[in-house]
Amino acid sequence: ENNCYLSHCYFGKRIRRWNEAAKMYYYDRGFCANPDETDRTFSLDTMPGEYPDFGQGDFRSPAMELEFQDGDRNTRFHYAGYQISAGKLSPEKLPHVYVESDKEAMTLEIWMKDEVRGLRLSLYYTIYEDAVLTRFVSIKNESEDIVKIHRLLSMSLDLGEQDYDILTLGGAHTEEKN
């Protein structure tokens, strides 16, 4: 939304028409950190962040933590573009689900860039005919610097307060509960 930060406004069952009720509202955020000191109505700490990075005033757990050669860990990824394609893109050399035809799925790829550090982050969302969503992330270092990855999650899901039921399926290697 603001300054090319990526947020989401809905996560749930399929919707036929967009409803403005889920849009983000701007009002004075009080003591929240603001990326723009002249705008008190926007804070990363209160925005439903799609893929939060480290050190920018969002005090929730980040989806990624990187360390640069100078010891700095701050990143500042901004929205850079997107592409929608038929079928499913697959992470290289990693297990994944497959489709037999490109008609079975659609993939959204969102690009984020950290211009200061020379990094490109790609977020992949594949939705299947049966309303299943899969996600993965890739990062590309376009600089000459060495970057150490401490944390790089496939997704971050920032849900508002509601009465949720949580189901967890514990297991171990070859003993998964499914």
Residue ranges of predicted features:
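Polysaccharide-binding surfaces and accessory modules of carbohydrate-active proteins
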Residues: 3-178
